[in-house]
């Protein structure tokens, strides 16, 4: 049996009272979403949260929960969705205390159930920004990145497997939010500035309704 993680009782009243907008950011490795997130944060003053970073930070912290997470990952099991959600909630509450104007939640949700759980326990996302790039382009970008970073083990086969995993897990998420009218599909094949112009147009429209 896989190790378990004890859940915390988290008071979300300050977060709900703040009523700030939440945006989910979805895009494959090499889609350029990291660069776009940096630009969005600089322009709008939103708080950028990455569920992967929050998990890594908790493991590094040496806390009892971090030790439980390490045990789960070492056993080859997946970290339960609700544990990731607790980490996100705690990070959001800390940011609200510091006066956050809203959130960009990166690499989230990874599956439909994760998005539904977030929205039922916290609040609905205003928009889901999907940075859409053709698979061939992603492979080229990742191979180029591997050469320049010295990660020669990132060969075409490994990269294609990573992309396949991303596409198969993310397709239902994209379809789900598209059906709810919340998905903004951004063609992320162009220049950084061209892509950002599309992002800004959509975020301005969404935030003007607040």
UniProtKB/Swiss-Prot annotation:
Residues 144-154 are annotated as: LID. GO terms for biological process: ADP biosynthetic process; AMP metabolic process; ATP metabolic process; nucleoside triphosphate biosynthetic process. Pfam families: ADK. HAMAP family: Adenylate_kinase_Adk, Adenylate_kinase_AK1. AMP binds at residues 51, 56, 77-79, 107-110, 114, 151, 162. Its main location: cytoplasm. Monomer. This is Adenylate kinase isoenzyme 1. Keywords: ATP-binding, Cytoplasm, Kinase, Nucleotide-binding, Transferase. CDD domains: ADK. Consists of three domains, a large central CORE domain and two small peripheral domains, NMPbind and LID, which undergo movements during catalysis. The LID domain closes over the site of phosphoryl transfer upon ATP binding. Assembling and dissambling the active center during each catalytic cycle provides an effective means to prevent ATP hydrolysis. The keyword DNA repair does not apply. GO terms for cellular component: cytoplasm; cytosol. Catalyzes the reversible transfer of the terminal phosphate group between ATP and AMP. Plays an important role in cellular energy homeostasis and in adenine nucleotide metabolism. It catalyses: AMP + ATP = 2 ADP. The keyword Plastid does not apply. Belongs to the adenylate kinase family. AK1 subfamily. It comes from the Eukaryota. It comes from Caenorhabditis elegans. It is found in: Cytoplasm. NCBIfam families: aden_kin_iso1 (TIGR01360), PRK14527.1 (NF011100).
């Amino acid at each position: 049996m896989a190790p378990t993680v004890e859940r915390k009782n988290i008071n979300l009243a300050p977060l709900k009272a703040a009523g700030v907008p939440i945006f989910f950011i979805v895009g494959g490795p090499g889609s350029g979403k990291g660069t776009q997130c940096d630009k969005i944060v600089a322009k709008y003053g939103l708080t950028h949260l990455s569920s992967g970073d929050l998990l890594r930070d908790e493991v590094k912290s040496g806390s009892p929960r971090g030790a439980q997470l390490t045990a789960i990952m070492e056993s080859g099991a997946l970290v339960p969705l609700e544990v990731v959600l607790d980490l996100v909630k705690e990070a959001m509450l800390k940011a609200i205390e510091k006066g956050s104007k809203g959130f960009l939640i990166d690499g989230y949700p990874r599956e439909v159930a994760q998005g539904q759980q977030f929205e039922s326990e916290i609040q609905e996302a205003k928009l889901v920004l999907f940075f859409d790039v053709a698979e061939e382009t992603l492979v080229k970008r990742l191979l180029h990145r591997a050469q320049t970073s010295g990660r020669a083990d990132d060969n075409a086969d490994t990269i294609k497997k990573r992309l396949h995993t991303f596409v198969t897990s993310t397709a239902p998420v994209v379809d789900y939010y598209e059906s709810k009218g919340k998905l903004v599909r951004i063609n992320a094949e162009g220049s950084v500035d061209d892509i950002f112009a599309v992002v800004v147009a959509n975020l301005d429209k969404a935030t003007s309704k607040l």
